[in-house]
């Protein structure tokens, strides 16, 4: 399941 996750660092 894919839930809204915070943006990943570059």
From Swiss-Prot:
Protein name as it appears in the record: Bradykinin-potentiating peptide 10d
Any one GO MF annotation of this record: peptidase inhibitor activity
Subcellular compartments: Secreted
The keyword Secreted appears for this protein: yes
UniProt modified residues of type Pyrrolidone carboxylic acid: 1
Keywords tagged on the record: Hypotensive agent, Metalloenzyme inhibitor, Metalloprotease inhibitor, Protease inhibitor, Pyrrolidone carboxylic acid, Secreted, Toxin
UniProt tissue specificity: Expressed by the venom gland.
Task performed by this protein: This peptide evokes slight hypotension (-2 mmHg), when injected alone into rats. It has no bradykinin-potentiating effect, when 60 nmol of BPP-10d are coinjected with 0.5 ug of bradykinin into rats. It inhibits angiotensin converting enzyme (ACE) activity with a K(i)app of 9.12 uM.
One cellular-component annotation, GO: extracellular region
Transmembrane spans: none
Similarity comment: family membership: Belongs to the bradykinin-potentiating peptide family.
GO terms for biological process, alphabetical: regulation of blood pressure
Signal sequence coordinates: none
